[in-house]
Amino acid sequence: MIRITVPATSANLGIGYDTLGMAVSLYSHFTFDRAETLTITGCPEQFQNEDNLVYESFVNALAEWGEKTFPVSIDISTEVPVARGLGSSSTCVVAGIMGAAALTGHTVTREELVAIATAVEGHPDNVAPAILGAAVCSFTPEGELPRCLRYEVSKRLRFITIIPPYEVHTSDARKVVPQEVPLSTAVWQMGRIAGLTRG
């Protein structure tokens, strides 16, 4: 049996829209084991099948490495609320890939893990800090693998999580993001982003 723990993340920090995220101290815990049939527990029944994001990521990783898919049991226990802006999907993606590596004995580098997770998730801003920890500025040059710059977060800072009593999916949240911001707002944000590392 393999146990994997992945931290929640908060992304789109300040001026770092779609690029800057950080790991936070809420966690999702996953166990993986080979099985006779696919079994998924610890999540709503509608996700206890092949459409489960953990399993989809597991299968994608196997395909990336030229491995055949095999039945697996997956148990999920999470502190990370779904669709509340804390990277719940990223925890699933990262765990699925790591579970595939562990059960097949495949050695995966952090760079490879970020690249596969980004391909599944669509962008690296949540998966990169979930893998690397701390704060990460990440971007993907056209036709290239994701690049990540990791920064330690000041220990002087304390974070508060405010979780709304309703779900907000990323696709819906993006619809209300303004396409332009005033220069003064951008300057204000840039001037304060260093506080993340310096406190």
Task: Cite the ranges covered by each PLM segment.
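Glycine/small-residue-rich loop that forms an oxyanion/phosphate-binding "nest" at active or ligand-binding sites
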Residues: 78-129
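N-proximal short alpha-helices
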Residues: 3, 86, 101, 146, ...
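ATP-binding N-lobe of GHMP and related small-molecule kinases
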Residues: 1-84, 98, 102, 106-108
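Generic, ordered loop/turn and secondary-structure boundary motif
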Residues: 18-25, 48, 81-83, 87, ...
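Conserved active-site and cofactor/substrate-binding residues in soluble primary-metabolism enzymes
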Residues: 15, 25, 48-56, 87-91, ...
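FAD-binding core of FAD-dependent oxidoreductases
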Residues: 6, 10-12, 16-23, 86-93, ...
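Short amphipathic alpha-helical segments, especially helix-boundary/capping motifs
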Residues: 3-6, 32-37, 72-76, 91, ...
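ATP-dependent small-molecule kinase catalytic core of the GHMP/sugar-kinase superfamily
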Residues: 109-199
